[in-house]
Amino acid sequence: MLDQLTLCLLLNFLCANVLANTSVFNPCVSQNELSEYEAHQVMENWPVPPIDRAYKCFLTCVLLDLGLIDERGNVQIDKYMKSGVVDWQWVAIELVTCRIEFSDERDLCELSYGIFNCFKDVKLAAEKYVSISNAK
């Protein structure tokens, strides 16, 4: 199993950067900041695709407000782990796999939505696998 330092180094090496807060585009300029409770409610009720671009940008702003991503689209692994959304046992490989899937994406809204939607799908698949394994 990877330790936290190895995971951080691996993720930093594999993760590309995307500029969110440029003079050309900032997806959160017109968004009101949500309370922490409201932001967590949005995360718990993650929408099912297809999602329009405006909602992807809204979700990006929620992720930024919660500190789960930075303005370049990098996942803040420590905050993500503390959020309780993911389990350390499988997170390293899945985070890298999802990040690689969107490595060419330069649009912050598409990038952050894509990565976190991938995380959600992987987490649901893992939970389903565990429930099936426990039922046997």
From Swiss-Prot:
Listed GO CC annotations: extracellular region; extracellular space
Entry GO MF terms: odorant binding
Keywords for the protein's UniProt record, in alphabetical order: Disulfide bond, Olfaction, Sensory transduction, Signal, Transport
Its job: Present in the aqueous fluid surrounding olfactory sensory dendrites and are thought to aid in the capture and transport of hydrophobic odorants into and through this fluid.
Protein name, UniProt field: General odorant-binding protein 57e
One Pfam family here: PBP_GOBP
Source organism per UniProt: Drosophila melanogaster
Disulfide feature: 28-61, 57-109, 98-118
Signal peptide range: 1-20
Residue intervals passing through the bilayer: none
InterPro entries assigned to the protein according to its UniProt record, in alphabetical order: PBP/GOBP, PBP_GOBP_sf
Organism superkingdom: Eukaryota
A single GO BP: sensory perception of smell
Keyword Signal: yes
Family in the record: Belongs to the PBP/GOBP family.
